[in-house]
């Protein structure tokens, strides 16, 4: 038989792949046997691994029967199965049909596994071919990936195949035989048994005619080790006809029915069932709780609504009901007047069809109390998850150990290559493309759902989330040909983009201004107040100008500048946009609004600077990368001036290079801090290896600290950076990822001291080892006030406030009519700094402006006081 087609895909960030990129995204499988022999057991299943749910054997009855319903049609087969890829399988007429071409399409059984000890095994399944092409079908045993974890097995695993072809062959691995004749119109029964012997296991495959039950052929393979058999079990199908067109997609090629298994080799893991409620995300802000439940593609016979219930007085009470969105497969709840003062257990309730009638699925979690009285609020920062180490057990376990109050996923929750089988980047069949992106997104929830169910989650989209290497949104513009995508705009259809945004962001607080952009593409930029931390959640890409056709011609990629003589002022052009006027107006309002907040943070996709100097697996030197928020420069400065008004730190990702930066606008260190968190699993590597050392280096921080001017002319101070190893490849994929500077970050907001601590944790770190386990240069602590570090020209008279503790203070330049800054002070006294001579209005209040003084001027003395009562 031909070798199995690989499921895994490129480890590199694929920004320039075209629409039909399946072949480019496939790669050779990891040698999992070699990996298992060389990996210490404690590396993967350690004290950190609790939330990964690597369970022991379940109940004593490990036999199974598929029992697919005859009266249900849908793409999702049921909670015990995972299909690769989702869009190439469907349930119809009581059988599973493969509706796409290609090699190694498969159905993974999630709740049954073959023991490492081996033993007798008996598997049966009916199957039939609906094409005369070179097709094959059968069962696969011992499916195992590099991490020896059932979800990793399901996505990246290889196993031993036993099956038959549409011609006259049957096979177990590389052992083949011929059928006496082809099965009849009713198909065949495949019967696989494993029998332990002194020399291993003997596998016997018999093919029977389904109608007559007459044996048509048999083949045996001897000497198979228990290690080879251990792992997942699956059905597989393959049709070698090339990529199926959108018009042909949906026509069945082959089918399976009545899959059964029994024997001592099987172990039950019913706790691994997945769906139909796959995972949820929620936020809690200003008394309103929003939650989105994610579903697989259900059918017309299944329920169309979902109930949200909370536990009160030992009973479940329904508080909201929501429709399942037809395209996004989500249900979003919005509950006002939420009880923020206590942990609230919740469950989602959904009715669906399986064999025997209706079933009810329950998904439970907790909406935690709002930690308003907690001195420290911890935010976990995550981005950029290639799938080679799915389900990212060390990141999930590390996050669980830190127990952050808020999760922040800043973009690239998946890549075009995630889950293998290429990418459906096309505009013709929106449903097929939506199923493709849904399977990639669901992997994110499968990895981190146990964390998200119990804590507020910020989730923002970046370029790869909408199938772009770089996305220049230009206010919702549409691009009708892929080769024009660098001109600006979205290639994927607006209804697809909106579905993806609904999947990832519909649980966020209501948008600041919900008016859609061009082509009716929705927006989600908003604010969230939780634990008395005020967050601004931005969309870096939606309004950004595309470089191709806008900037002067540039050799090579329009977003990569390689000319060392390049003058960055030549691309700082009028009309170029970054955040856009709407988000700038939002930031102006947000920085002035401190109701219910003690500290502020901006969360967005990427940094407002171009720091990495070397890119890609060969570490190619680049002067500038226009994908960063360092370009366009003037809008970049405008954004930072607004963020600075609220003393807000900036949290983001995208760069695949952990960095702690201090922005500069007119000079160095006159703008906020930025923490660019590591990628969860880095593919495309970047490094900061400047040719010259920075000015004024920080001697206590390793690797090129100091003041720099980036390739776009922006001023930036590098406080810490965790560069990858030049020779990053390792046999252990987790070690490779750590060598590429993968991991996660934390921001700790200390409301008592108004200090912020940035922590940067390598992928293979152990939080129990303390701060020394972090990347060199971290942790670092700085004051909230350091986010507006300008040198004042003077100070207004000292404020002495009565009637409020820790009041809000706002300073307004009367000549310019502009807010200089707003903050919530500590205590009742504050001497406001100002940065120009003149008259100022000072406003003071608790959760509203209750007092103001106009015409206040800088005072040279320290004894002058401005008494204010609120």
Language model features with spans:
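Secretory/extracellular carbohydrate-interaction modules
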Residues: 100-174
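Flexible glycan-contacting loops in extracellular carbohydrate-active proteins
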Residues: 216-251
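Glycine-aromatic-enriched beta-strand/loop faces of beta-sandwich-type recognition domains
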Residues: 140-196, 712-736
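Long, structured stretches of catalytic cores involved in phosphate-ester chemistry, encompassing
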Residues: 255, 260-264, 286, 295, ...
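Short carbohydrate-recognition loop motifs
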Residues: 89-105
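N-terminal secretory signal peptides
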Residues: 1-31
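N-terminal twin-arginine translocation
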Residues: 23-34, 43-59
């Amino acid at each position: 038989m031909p070798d199995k087609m690989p499921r895994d895909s490129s480890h590199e960030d694929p920004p320039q792949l075209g629409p039909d990129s399946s072949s480019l995204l496939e790669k050779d499988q990891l040698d999992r046997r070699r990996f298992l022999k060389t990996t210490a057991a404690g590396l993967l299943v350690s004290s950190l691994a609790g939330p990964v749910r690597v369970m022991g054997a379940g109940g004593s009855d490990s036999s199974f029967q598929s029992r697919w319903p005859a009266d249900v049609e849908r793409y999702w087969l049921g909670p015990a199965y995972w299909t690769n890829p989702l869009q190439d399988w469907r349930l119809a007429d009581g059988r599973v049909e493969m509706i796409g071409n290609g090699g190694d399409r498969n159905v993974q059984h999630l709740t049954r596994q073959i023991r490492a000890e081996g033993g007798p095994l008996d598997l049966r399944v009916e199957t039939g071919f609906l094409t005369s092409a070179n097709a094959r079908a059968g069962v696969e045993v011992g499916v195992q990936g590099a991490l020896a974890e059932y979800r990793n097995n399901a996505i990246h695993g290889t196993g031993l195949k036993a099956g038959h072809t549409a011609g006259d062959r049957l096979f177990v691995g590389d052992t083949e035989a011929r059928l006496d004749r082809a099965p009849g119109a009713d198909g065949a029964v495949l019967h696989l048994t494993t029998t332990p012997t002194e020399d291993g296991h003997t596998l016997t495959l018999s093919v029977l005619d389904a109608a007559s039950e007459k044996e048509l052929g048999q083949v045996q393979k001897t000497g198979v080790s228990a290690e080879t058999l251990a792992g997942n079990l699956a059905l597989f199908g393959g049709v070698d006809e090339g990529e199926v067109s959108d018009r042909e997609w949906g026509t069945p090629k082959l089918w399976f029915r009545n899959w059964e298994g029994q024997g001592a080799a099987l172990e039950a893991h019913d706790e691994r069932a997945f769906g139909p409620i796959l995972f949820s995300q929620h936020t809690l802000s200003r008394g309103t709780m929003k939650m989105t439940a994610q579903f697989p593609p259900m059918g017309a016979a299944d329920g169309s609504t979902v109930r949200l219930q909370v536990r009160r007085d030992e009973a479940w009470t329904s508080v909201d009901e929501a429709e399942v969105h037809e395209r996004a497969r989500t249900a979003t709840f919005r509950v006002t007047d939420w009880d923020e003062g206590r942990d609230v257990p919740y469950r989602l309730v959904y009715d669906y069809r399986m064999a025997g009638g209706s079933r009810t699925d329950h998904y439970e979690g907790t909406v935690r109390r709002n930690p308003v009285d907690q001195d420290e609020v911890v935010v976990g920062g995550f981005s950029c998850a290639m799938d080679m180490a799915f389900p990212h057990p060390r990141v999930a376990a590390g996050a669980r150990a830190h127990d952050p109050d808020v999760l922040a996923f800043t973009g690239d929750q998946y890549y075009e290559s995630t889950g293998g089988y290429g990418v459906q980047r096309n505009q013709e069949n929106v449903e097929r493309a939506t199923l493709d992106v849904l399977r990639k997104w669901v992997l994110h929830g499968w990895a981190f759902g146990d964390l998200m169910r119990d804590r507020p989650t910020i989730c923002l989209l970046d370029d790869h989330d909408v199938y772009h290497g770089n996305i220049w949104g230009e206010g919702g513009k549409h691009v009708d040909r892929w080769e024009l995508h660098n001109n600006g705009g979205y290639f994927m259809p607006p209804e697809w983009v909106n579905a993806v945004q609904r999947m990832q962001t519909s649980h966020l607080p209501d948008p600041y201004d919900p008016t859609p952009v061009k082509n009716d593409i929705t927006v989600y930029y908003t604010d969230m107040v939780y634990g008395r931390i005020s967050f601004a959640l931005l969309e870096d890409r939606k309004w950004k100008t595309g470089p191709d056709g806008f900037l002067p011609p540039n050799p090579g990629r329009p977003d990569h500048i390689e000319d060392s003589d390049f003058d960055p002022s030549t691309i700082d052009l009028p009309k170029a946009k970054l955040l856009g006027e709407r988000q700038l107006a939002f930031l102006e309002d947000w920085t002035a609004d401190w109701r219910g907040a003690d500290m502020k943070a901006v969360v967005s996709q990427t940094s407002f600077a171009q720091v990495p100097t070397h890119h890609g697996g060969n570490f190619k030197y680049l002067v500038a990368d226009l994908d960063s928020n360092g370009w366009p420069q003037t809008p970049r400065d405008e954004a930072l001036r607004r963020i600075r008004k609220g003393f807000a730190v900036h949290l983001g990702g995208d760069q695949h290079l952990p960095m702690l930066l201090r922005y500069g606008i007119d000079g160095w260190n006159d703008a906020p801090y930025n923490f660019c968190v590591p990628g969860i699993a880095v593919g495309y590597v970047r490094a900061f290896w400047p040719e010259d050392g920075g000015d004024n280096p920080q001697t206590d921080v390793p690797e090129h600290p100091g003041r720099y001017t980036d390739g776009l002319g922006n001023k930036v101070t590098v406080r810490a950076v965790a560069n990858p190893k030049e020779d990053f490849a390792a046999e252990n994929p987790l070690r490779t990822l750590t060598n590429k500077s993968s991991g996660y970050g934390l921001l700790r907001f200390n409301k008592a001291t108004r200090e912020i601590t940035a922590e940067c944790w390598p992928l293979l770190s152990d939080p129990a080892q303390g701060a020394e386990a972090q990347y060199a240069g971290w942790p670092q602590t700085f004051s909230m006030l350091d986010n507006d570090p300008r040198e004042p020209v003077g100070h207004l008279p000292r404020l002495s406030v009565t009637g409020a503790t820790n009041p809000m203070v706002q300073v307004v330049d009367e000549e310019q009519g502009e807010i200089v800054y707003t903050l919530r002070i500590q205590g009742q006294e504050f001497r406001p700094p100002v940065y120009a001579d003149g008259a100022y209005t000072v406003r003071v209040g608790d959760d509203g402006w209750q007092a103001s003084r106009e015409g206040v001027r800088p005072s040279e003395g320290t004894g002058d006081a401005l008494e204010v009562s609120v």
